[in-house]
Amino acid sequence: MDVRRRLPPKLRRPLPITESSHHHRKTPFPADVDRSPSPTPKASDALPLPLYLTNGIFFTLFFSVAYYLLHRWRDKIRSSTPLHIVTLSELAAIVSLIASFIYLLGFFGIDFVQSFVSRADVDVDIDVEPDILEADRRPCSKLMDQPPPPPVVMSSEEDEEIVKSVVSGKTPSYSLESKLGDCYRAASIRREAVQRTTGRSLLGLPLDGFDYESILGQCCEMPIGYVQIPVGIAGPLLLNGCEYVVPMATTEGCLVASTNRGCKAIYACGGATGILLKDGMTRAPVVRFSTAKRASDLKFFLEDPLNFDTLAVVFNKSSRFARLQSIQCSMAGKNLYIRFCCSTGDAMGMNMVSKGVQNVLEFLQSDFPDMDVIGISGNFCSDKKPAAVNWIEGRGKSVVCEAIITDDVVKKVLKTTVPALVELNMLKNLAGSAVAGALGGFNAHAANIVSAVFIATGQDPAQNIESSHCITMMEAINNGKDLHISVTMPSIEVGTVGGGTQLASQSACLNLLGVKGANKESHGSNSRLLATIVAGSVLAGELSLMSAIAAGQLVRSHMKYNRSSRDMSKIGS
């Protein structure tokens, strides 16, 4: 999908705040300086009465004299009086009609004139945002004693009125996009309303440079800006004979550098091998019957191989990519949990499988009219939660990735030894995780890499929970000289179409990996490749972190790369 950034309309914004402006100002509101913003001149200020009264008078006058003249015109037709003969009252009515029409015609140009007046006065309110920032610097106890920051005047009188309406609660904030028809303008107005309501500044949260049309109805509601996350690259990752530069969006120092070192070690040893074991997204509705006997009847019906083809036809109608693979049932009293599993092409597939499940439930109602559908999701799926069913059965893409690291590379690149890595993996990732009662967490930090790649490529960050299920294995081979390392990840949930993948930044990261959009030649191959790359990146991250721990370098490296000396000095002072 071709996403283009739309140039936003020019709104008045506060000027940049220099560092010196805060050094020389001790209090936000000095007594000897008037910080109140000067009123913005309006085209309507020239009117003798307030704008709303003037409008009311001319609207009333226009419709009143129009009605009067129409009434007189009908009377003249009935009495055969010539139309060109007019009385003094009729003449006054005609003049009033023309005057009110001219005013109403000009009224709609006031906002247009106002935009030029406002543009010439761009320096107004230069100290408004610094005052809000100064309030941010004060302790909460002092902040409570201070008046709220003065509002920023919007670029037009109409926008200013809308902001006031949102603040007062007359206009719902969520309805701005539909009412205005301009997503950027809606976000700008909502942003200013939030600042006035909370009395806190959003100066550090960017508004410009983002296509708000692209997220309408699919990615985010009620936007007021966007968060910037730095994106680094690790690699090249040599996986299945191909090189990949892996984008990682993170704020954790040392993470990208560590993963990059793992990629370097894997590359030096001939690369890694990734194998896709399974590909199927799941959804599990919960239905209830009056008795456990009736629930078991449906269970036996669904598990009968003779009925599977019929159910598959009904399910597959939801999409040309959806293909039902299996149905798994579990009972709890008279409640039945039905776990549907299907392939979903290059999409992550939650919406696709949900539509198919809805079709099957409607089909089953004819044979089981006493079935009560409690919910389309009964948590037997299981989505965005650590669950044994995902760890055992898998969800999304199940991938295993392995590599053989030679003794020479272990010593020179990873700065440790094969026996030290094998022992640490057993005591930390296996025994230590068992002591902790871990569920799918038999690894060092798989979630770190999964989250970073997910955010960069537009995946659902919440699905990092089950996608990070991973068991890391290390074994000495070739008479103890070399290291065999593998990661097994049964539930990587990714897609290359839909959701956040269509955003410009995330689409660029997918393009960097060569998996942007849907693969038209082989449906689903792009998402499967992305899952394999995620597993390969986790392999590199596990190898590097475990080596750092084995060599005693973890604390030293994090103090160097993951702790800002500038921040620490501020805390110390």
Curated annotation (Swiss-Prot):
Q: Which PANTHER family match?
A: 3-HYDROXY-3-METHYLGLUTARYL-COENZYME A REDUCTASE
The record lists the organism as Panax ginseng (Korean ginseng)
Tissues expressing this chain: Mostly expressed in the petioles of seedlings and roots (both in main roots and lateral roots), and, to a lower extent, in seeds, seedlings, leaves, stems and flowers.
List the catalytic activities from the record: (R)-mevalonate + 2 NADP(+) + CoA = (3S)-3-hydroxy-3-methylglutaryl-CoA + 2 NADPH + 2 H(+)
Q: Where is the composition biased (Basic residues)?
A: 1-13
Main localization of the protein described in the UniProt heading = endoplasmic reticulum
A Gene Ontology BP annotation from the UniProt entry:
response to jasmonic acid
Q: How does it sit in the membrane?
A: Multi-pass membrane protein
Provide the membrane-side ranges marked Cytoplasmic in the record: 67-92, 550-573
Q: Could you tell me which pathway this protein works in?
A: Metabolic intermediate biosynthesis; (R)-mevalonate biosynthesis; (R)-mevalonate from acetyl-CoA: step 3/3
GO molecular function per UniProt:
hydroxymethylglutaryl-CoA reductase (NADPH) activity
What name does this protein carry?
3-hydroxy-3-methylglutaryl coenzyme A reductase 1
What GO cellular component term, any one, is given? peroxisomal membrane
Q: Does the keyword Oxidoreductase apply?
A: yes
Region Disordered: start and end of each range?
1-41
Residue ranges spanning the membrane: these are 46-66, 93-113, 529-549
Q: Which SUPFAM superfamilies match?
A: NAD-binding domain of HMG-CoA reductase, Substrate-binding domain of HMG-CoA reductase
The glycosylation sites are: 316
